[in-house]
Amino acid sequence: MGRFIFVSFGLLVVFLSLSGIGADQECLPGWSFYEGHCYKVFDEYKNWTDAEQYCTEQENGGHLVSFHNREEVDFVVKLGYTILKADIVWIGLRDFWRECHWGWSNGAQLDYKGWNDEPNCFIAYTVGNKWLRRKCSSTQQFVCKSPA
């Protein structure tokens, strides 16, 4: 009887782990889940256009990260600094037409702002939550975001 219970419990544990119960199965391995999206920090240096293209070519698609509230920024800041030990990453904000028509690379509405007045692409300092405009041709590490 005891062996039957032990085997049954063992099979239950295996079943639950394979079904994703209690595990973070919303994102691909190496990606982190937050509020319906998956995020991944890339420790590679690319210009803004190449970083955005790299994000769209990932298995789960996506774009450079867009922010819609302070809590999302805090999540990405913690994720970025933990992985990179650096404090600057590309984000998906850019003046696409160079006429101050700002928009996220994924088409989302710009509803949260934090920057100064310089070139047409944006970096985020992962410490201090400052957004700065930077030449799109410069290279930085970056964070991709995709729907879960």
Curated annotation (Swiss-Prot):
Residues 1-23 form the signal peptide. Belongs to the true venom lectin family. It comes from Bitis arietans. It is found in: Secreted. It comes from the Eukaryota. Expressed by the venom gland. This is C-type lectin 2. Homodimer; disulfide-linked. Glycans are attached at N47.
